[in-house]
């Protein structure tokens, strides 16, 4: 897997962590198995006895949902900015206290 795809997958995992509760149970289940358990769409389709195209549509819909919410709320972007700021803090005690507040 090249670096771009790896970064994209990592972002999808993080968006799922942030916005996953907004999905239906079925969407969350399929997306979790696809992204976090690294199952192929065909494996998920076989497991739940549905068409691969159905899984593809659910995954696509999840990504659209995440992108819409991120465009409005920018929780992922703000999280990334906070992490960059934490890295710049040199005082170990202050850094620990701020990390606990996350």
UniProtKB/Swiss-Prot annotation:
Q: Which Pfam families match?
A: UPF0122
Query: Transmembrane ranges?
Result: none
Family of this protein: Belongs to the UPF0122 family.
Function field: Might take part in the signal recognition particle (SRP) pathway. This is inferred from the conservation of its genetic proximity to ftsY/ffh. May be a regulatory protein.
Q: Which HAMAP family match?
A: UPF0122 (MF_00245)
Could you identify this protein by its name?
Answer: UPF0122 protein MPN_424
The organism is Mycoplasma pneumoniae (strain ATCC 29342 / M129 / Subtype 1) (Mycoplasmoides pneumoniae)
């Amino acid at each position: 897997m090249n670096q771009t795809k790896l970064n994209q997958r990592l972002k999808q995992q993080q968006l799922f962590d942030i916005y996953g509760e907004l999905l239906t149970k079925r969407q969350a289940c399929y997306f979790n198995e696809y992204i976090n358990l690294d199952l192929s769409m065909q494996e998920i389709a076989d497991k739940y006895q549905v068409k691969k195209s159905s899984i593809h549509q659910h995954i696509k819909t999840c990504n659209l949902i995440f992108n819409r919410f991120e465009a409005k709320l920018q929780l992922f972007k703000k999280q990334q900015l906070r992490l960059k700021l934490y890295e710049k803090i040199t005082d170990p005690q202050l850094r620990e206290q701020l990390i606990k507040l996350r």
